[in-house]
Amino acid sequence: MKIILSRFVLGTALSIAPFASTQAQCVADLNLNAMVDYDDLLILLANYGQSCETEIWHDPIISEIHYNPSTQQGADTEYEFVELMNPFPFDIHVGGWQLADGIACVFPENTWIEAEGFLLTANDTAVLAPLLPEFVPLLPWTLSSGLHNSGESLRLVRPNGTEADHVIYSDAGTWPQDADGAGGSLEWKGSGYDNSFSTSWAGSNALGGSPGTPNSTWTD
């Protein structure tokens, strides 16, 4: 009986072994080849020290660019601005973020944009400050920044160096001509429009644009 039982047990173990091996999961099998081998060690070493936390960003949007104010309004250096909009129904923290390429502007710590509100960056904050509603942050450009009238690249960069938004505007092609020295600013049309495309922008209806307030051309 012992021999028969041993054969039965052994046979049963052998018969279920293939099934069991296909169902087993090895945490250390990083390359998923059903065994823990040297390649798994190389993968581990290549990623040693990396954080396993996933960063979740709530990105504001480049929503208005006033790159060529009209002579009626005043000098370019006084009235140029770039606006960001918070599309979320809650306040977002943007301390440590920055605008780069065409202009340089680093956002100080404890900088917040109110829910569905705005942040303005400009060369001459003293001139633009009286035009803004209360609680709209106004940050100065650095390094003698200024917007080119013929076109510019504007990048919004997160604190970790990744790109949150990127607009390359122009005064040519299908870009709105109303924003090129005719008095209006370049306004993003709103949600549903990809702001990397020229057709997602329009010249503002108001002289000098709509800094710190909903865009005059919003279609939603």
Question: Model regions: which residues?
Answer:
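Alpha-helical segments with a strong preference for the paired helices of cellulosomal dockerin domains
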Residues: 30-52
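Bacterial N-terminal signal peptides
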Residues: 7-18
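Disulfide-bonded cysteine-rich modules in secreted/extracellular proteins
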Residues: 26-33, 62, 220
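Positively charged n-region of N-terminal signal peptides that target proteins for export
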Residues: 1-7
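Activation on beta-sandwich/Ig-like modules and their edge loops
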Residues: 53-198, 204-210, 218-220
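Boundary at the C-terminal end of the N-terminal hydrophobic targeting segment
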Residues: 22-24
